Curated annotation (Swiss-Prot):
InterPro entries: C-type_lectin-like (IPR001304), C-type_lectin-like/link_sf (IPR016186), C-type_lectin/snaclec_domain (IPR050111), C-type_lectin_CS (IPR018378), CTDL_fold (IPR016187)
Gene3D superfamilies: Mannose-Binding Protein A, subunit A
S-S pairs: C27-C38, C55-C152, C127-C144
Signal peptide range: 1-23
Keyword Cytoplasm appears in the UniProt entry: no
SMART domains: CLECT
Protein keywords: Blood coagulation cascade activating toxin, Calcium, Disulfide bond, Hemostasis impairing toxin, Metal-binding, Secreted, Signal, Toxin
Function in brief: Regulatory subunit of the blood coagulation factor X-activating enzyme. Activates coagulation factor X (F10) by cleaving the Arg-Ile bond at position 234, activates coagulation factor IX (F9) by cleaving the Arg-Val bond at position 226 and is also able to activate protein C (PROC). May serve as an exosite by which the enzyme recognizes and binds to the Gla domain of factor X (F10) in a calcium-dependent manner.
Provenance organism: Macrovipera lebetinus
Name of the protein in question: Snaclec coagulation factor X-activating enzyme light chain 2
Amino acid sequence: MGRSISVSFGLLAVFLSLSGTGAGLDCPPDSSPYRYFCYRVFKEQKNWADAERFCAERPNNGHLVSIESMEEAEFVAQLLSKITGKFITHFWIGLRIEDKKQQCRSEWSDGSSVSYDNLLKREFRKCFGLEKGTGYRSWFNLNCEEPYPFVCKVPPNC
């Protein structure tokens, strides 16, 4: 009886430790699971609009990554720190300032609202990325036409 309880407790501990990671998700190849989505880094450089279009054309219709919590920001930072090369300084994320009805407001390319903010410095540029100098943890305004690598966030396979 005691052995059965310790095995059950051990399995419960493993389940709870993996529950926030998305370990049970069926993600496309070369993607990393986290919570309810799959993330993939592309080193190929594109401007913001082309990177967003590329993510939307992926299987499962993704978007440039939206970062909605400090925990998700840390996951993305760790993902980028493993993949980056010496000359890669920025990565596009899905945040952009939109001019709608003469009101400038920030929103994610997937339509979700900005509920978590990690903007280092606000400038007049309309697109945002992560910078190597901050360990890919802070958001920077970048010129939307500059080519940078990017991160796509897609739903898992059904």
